[in-house]
Amino acid sequence: MTVGFAMCGSFCTYSAVFPVMEELAASYDLLPIFSPAASTIHSRFGTAGAHIQRATDICGVTPLRTIQEVEPIGPKKLLDALIIAPCAGNTLAKLAHGIADTSVTMAAKSHLRNGRPVIIAVSTNDGLAAAAENIGRLLVRKNHYFVPFGQDDAIGKPTSLVADFSRLPMTLEAALEGRQIQPLLLG
């Protein structure tokens, strides 16, 4: 079974995301996909090159990084499921509004044409603000499944939401059966 693993630019979560990628690589063939931000931005959490290399080492293939590289995902039915982890607020907005102008959003659009699941692991500082509407739109869409999420710092960042990445494998399994894992909201 082949699973796409798309990464957006919520760099602070990479230390939690890469171990889950490693766990999934033991059971699935993973096709890594990097957003433009993930592909190019160096941050205090590491360089773009280091992140690309780590994904390559885990998955055994270099991440796809362009619209042209990901567009065949749908027509060639390359994936059984697509994970977006972390899924930043900008990508949430684009998915909610049907905008496919990055490698990750085009991968989702192309993959969804086959009626197969997209698993979203949200990570955004405005999840209970501007991004809340976009999360709501995606929650009711067919073939969209969310990794359970909650506030990561209710006092310091009261609108921030982040997925519990350790629940990504069980969310993927449920999504492949057409089910949303519960509970979705973590307290």
Where are the regions a protein language model picked out?
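A cross-family phosphate/adenosyl-ligand binding-site feature
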Residues: 1-118, 123-187
